[in-house]
Amino acid sequence: MNKIIYRKTTKADMKILMKLRLEMLREVNGLSGEYEYDENFIFESRRYFESGEQTTVIASDGETLVGCASLSYTWIMPTFSHPTGNRAHLMNVYTRADYRRRGISKKMVEILIGEAKGNGVTEISLDATEMGIPLYESLGFKASDSCMVMDLEG
């Protein structure tokens, strides 16, 4: 194993990032190895990554992409507890199975937390898997009972 290199993605990384994200979505959602994106999903993902309203970090071992993590920015009306209205949602934190338990996800999230602070973000939310909860707690994230969600698709 080489030294792991971390960097923010560019538009040129879209193809490799989508490939790793597909691997993650198959694993997290229990999809078969044959599952592929549909055209609309690819279009919307490309539009999202090119919008500039997110920061994605990737981790590489030489030429091999081994992990990714994204921070999606949201701007809401300012509140007393969040006077800038700048918030973010952490998502798609993923490290390939043979690279887990080496601190790669933690490092990617730390980079994104620093990026968020630099952009004036006052709150980061996330949806955690059972496997990810200890990682997020170690970084200072806390469970919240104050969030409610309405699914407009269902």
Q: PLM features: residue spans?
A:
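Conserved beta-strand in the GNAT
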Residues: I58, T64-Y73, H89, Y94
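Conserved acetyl-CoA pyrophosphate-binding loop and the N-cap/start of the following alpha-helix
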Residues: Y99, G103-I111
